[in-house]
């Protein structure tokens, strides 16, 4: 055992460790050495470094305890990603060119583009492979054996190679942690897909994260269902109806506001420069009101509107070629009014 003081805690080096160090897109294990919390683990220059906030006496014996919930979650994510990547490679020849696991999702970068229908089939086939509950095989082939195998690898490998086989879906060089049987993954769900370089980036979840996501989506959908008085399976149609109604009502409001602008403009016809106060107008309505009145008042027009949050919207229009002193006068008038205490019935 060795304990080195660092800038933000201590680096603990053991003669043996069951903690997985960060690498290959997979975060490190966390846990405890005796009662000292291990925040993260990294490999550097052949050493496994355990990052802690407290020191441990050098040369003492320690008992490590891995955060199993975290480890098993990462095993589920990593194993699920292997099956997806293997099936994509087998069906379309695309490579996994980037992989990252975070605390909520994993991302997989593929070298080619797949349609939604193709991804749906990959997802379905992945879950079929999971439910077969096949044993995951981990081997350490010799160099001669390795040369005869067709396996996935992102880079040229030297030294001893560790192969992870998911029967019927993937054979890949990998140093990460994995489940012992595919059934332990539980399920895989592809959440989103976006264009990325020459291919696509998948965002997906596996295992318990799928259940957590399903519970969240179900709770959200149930609340929407109650608010819209719609059945659970019909909320999308209910939202579409609500959007149509909202669009229709917005059209009516816009028409009524145009009529209001016409009346307001007529009231100030030929009046010269005009300053108006209207409460609660949206920014676009402030602009439309100023533009309408300016067309009739033979001067420039400024509209000032107070919002419910204490902020204000202001817009003023001037005619092309209007003298600068007129504009200055309007700005002075605006300044004088904004310095006054405003009341709700202005």
Predicted regions: what they are:
Residues 66, 124-134, 297, 332-341:
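A common structural junction motif
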Residues 70, 90-196:
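Functional cores that coordinate and move charged inorganic groups
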Residues 29-32, 79-89, 176, 284-295, ...:
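Short amphipathic alpha-helix segments
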Residues 11-12, 45-54, 106-112, 314-315, ...:
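A generic structural motif
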Residues 1-60:
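Conserved nucleotide-binding/hydrolysis modules and their immediate coupling elements
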Residues 191-346:
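Terminal appendage regions of diverse proteins
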Residues 3-18, 59-71, 157-171, 322-341:
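Short, hydrophobic/aliphatic alpha-helical segments
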Residues 17-33, 57-108, 341-345:
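Active/ligand-binding-proximal structured segments within catalytic/core domains
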